[in-house]
Amino acid sequence: MMAAKIKKGDKVVVLAGRDKGRTGEVLQVLPKEERALVRGVNVVKRHQRQTAQSEGGIISKEAPIHLSNIAVADPKDGKPTRVGFEVLDDGRKVRVAKRSGERIDG
């Protein structure tokens, strides 16, 4: 299995689709479907049936967006960047923004 370039909690920029240019935080990554849920992006309206716990009606929720349509935001300037990996002296593997060379985690 390949190392994940996009993880939960990352700030990402949408590259394509109706939300192009919007930024948001990754809420969940779905590796099998190659998709991710991003807060405030790709919001769809769903008809919800009324249950004992929740009220019915039309609710807005995020739909998963394909990983090819999002890119990690560079920690330096917030612009989209590709992600590389770097092995530190202590053996840890960290993600690095290819655009600025800045570390994304670690």
From Swiss-Prot:
UniProt keyword list: Ribonucleoprotein, Ribosomal protein, RNA-binding, rRNA-binding
Assigned GO CC terms: ribonucleoprotein complex; ribosome
Disulphide bonds in the chain: none
UniProt cross-references to Pfam families, sorted A to Z: KOW, ribosomal_L24
GO biological process entries: translation
Family annotation (SUPFAM superfamilies): Translation proteins SH3-like domain
Listed GO MF terms: rRNA binding; structural constituent of ribosome
Record carries keyword rRNA-binding: yes
Family classification: Belongs to the universal ribosomal protein uL24 family.
Biological role: One of two assembly initiator proteins, it binds directly to the 5'-end of the 23S rRNA, where it nucleates assembly of the 50S subunit.
Self-association and partners: Part of the 50S ribosomal subunit.
Name of the protein: Large ribosomal subunit protein uL24
Gene: rplX
